[in-house]
Amino acid sequence: MSVRGAYQVSVRGAYQVSARTLHRVDELAVTVIGHDRPGIVADVAEVLARLGLNLTDSTMTRLRGHFAMTLICTGEVPDDEVEAALRPLSGDGSLLATVRQVRPEGEIAPEGRPYLVSLHGADRLGIVAAVTRVLARAGGNITDLTTRLVGPLYVLVAEVDLPPGAGEEVAAHLATTAGELGVEVTIRPCEVDVL
């Protein structure tokens, strides 16, 4: 947290510093799911801005024609008021928005190295469970996971932070698991993304 002048406003983490005051700024987790249509992100962002909430982190995707978004925003509006303000967006029942107050945790520096795991092969039950179990047993923390079924082909891409020195052992275990599943898997170190 930094303050350069007695009346300068600076927001760092989950605290807001202003003219001789220090107070906590709430963080809210907002999830929106439902039938995809153009304008959902704009509609949600406008409601949050109108309430004075600052959108900090977000992710959004389409899952087999369904819209799914999770975001974190900061401000001083109770979660029930935010949920009520979002309710008109789902008037026809095609969207569901939920809001929950969360504790600010800040960014946690990874203790290991980031890796990218890619898998493709014939779809079958248990692929995600088997691959993520290998990563979990090694102490890996999955930071992003995307899966997609395209016809009979199943694709999985995961970003994972692995403990120092664990890359080769994890690669060996993933190769064994991939053989059992009848899929192809690769793992490689990757650079930390800006986003």
Model segments located where?
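A conserved regulatory-domain signal marking ACT and ACT-like small-molecule sensing domains
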Residues: R20-L195
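Long, intrinsically disordered low-complexity tandem-repeat segments
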Residues: S2-S18
